[in-house]
Amino acid sequence: MTRFKIVKDVFRSLEWNRRRNVLTGMIFVFLMCVVHSAPNALGREQAGGACEKRKGLVILVEFPDIAPAVDEAFVRDRFKKLDFYVREMSYGKVCTDVDITGWHRLPDSVKRYAISPANLQVDKSRVERLIRNAVNAADEKNDFLRYSFVVLFLGAAFKEYGMVGLCGYPGMLGWKEDVVLRTPKGQIVPGGVAIFTYQAHLGTLFHDIAHVWGGVRGGQRVLPCLYDHDIQARHPTSDAGFAEALINMGYWDPLSCHFYKRNIPPPGISSWTKLRLGWIPEEKVRVVDPKEESEVVLGPLEDGSSETLVIKIRLSESTYYLIENRQPIGNFDRHLPGKGVLIMYADDRIGECRHGASPVRLMNADPAVPYLQGAAFDPPGKELFVDKKNKIEIRIVERIGDSYRVRISNGKCVKP
């Protein structure tokens, strides 16, 4: 497949409603970017450098009672889009490539593998059986040591399987670091396993594969779901009010929302997620002392050329604030509920989003807007955040193009 065809496919997938003459010019520009191995101008500091490739094996799974609704070309296109997304989110540092097997028919009907759409109500034995049957079917013709993650791509629809996508490990089957899955030939299945129906959105693909890439550290998932699991149990799907579970990060990160709207690409990921994946260079993280006054020009998180991508205010060994700037630029942050400065409180002691607790949570600039869609701070009127307990004041002093000058006070003027 030519690079020109790849770029055309990417544009079509993102459903850009451009006029034909504008589109022609942009295809040429992006073609040149691809030819020179730079994902786009926003990640130009990575231009010329090789990306860290995440190689995956996609096992196509069919069931005896239903015919696959898609073909291999459809699946390949989905993962081509994932690569495009990952390159932009990592500023060109990381890319992904997959090998796709032929269709493997499992011994049981899809009903025997079907699960609940609510995470806390999933029959784990069914997930384990699906993974083992699919991996065993692919054992003979595939060398699993060549890959860092495995995907089961089902020829079934969401309503037939019960969940549009999930992470088997580290996820539904737990996240013990000593878990080892072996094939009948004795091959070790590396990394982890994600499962998707063919209707999975690009944001869902990233969400569950990111769980695998994050892995397990200190007995915790590095990248957990950022929606509340207990609320999701009561509102498991979009039709059942899934947005109610978005109490931590709203629609500002696909680890929380998967996507903002079904018919558009997912939003970009937050600085918290990028930091946990190791996708933000250390020199672009400005660490400030909350006891001293600091001013920082904060560039857009989507623009990898920004001198500062995130501000970190450490409160203790495990707690801190992150400040990022989200602007409608690039291919994905244009699909956000708003724009401005996001302020997040993080607590590394918290592993999962349960019972109202979360390892990261947005401070909400406008609580009157539901589902944290008004969380961004942006002048006029929403330029100040105050933490009275820790005596910290965060103020947007001015806007400079797409950047902001942000002042972090020492708290002397903040009354408890």
Where are the model-predicted features located?
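Bacterial N-terminal signal peptides
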Residues: 24-34
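Aromatic-lined ligand-binding clefts that engage carbohydrates, nucleic acids, or primary amines
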Residues: 153
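Extracellular hydrolytic enzyme modules, especially secreted metalloproteases
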Residues: 144, 156-332
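Surface-exposed acidic, glycine-flexible loop patches that form ligand/cofactor-binding
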Residues: 45-50, 123-150, 311-314
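Boundary at the C-terminal end of the N-terminal hydrophobic targeting segment
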Residues: 37-43
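N-terminal secretory signal peptides that target proteins for export/translocation
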Residues: 1-19
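Non-catalytic C-terminal accessory/binding modules of secreted extracellular proteins
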Residues: 47-49, 55-62, 67-73, 88-105, ...
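Divalent cation-coordinating acidic motifs and surrounding scaffolds
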Residues: 73-75, 79-134, 177-179, 199-200, ...
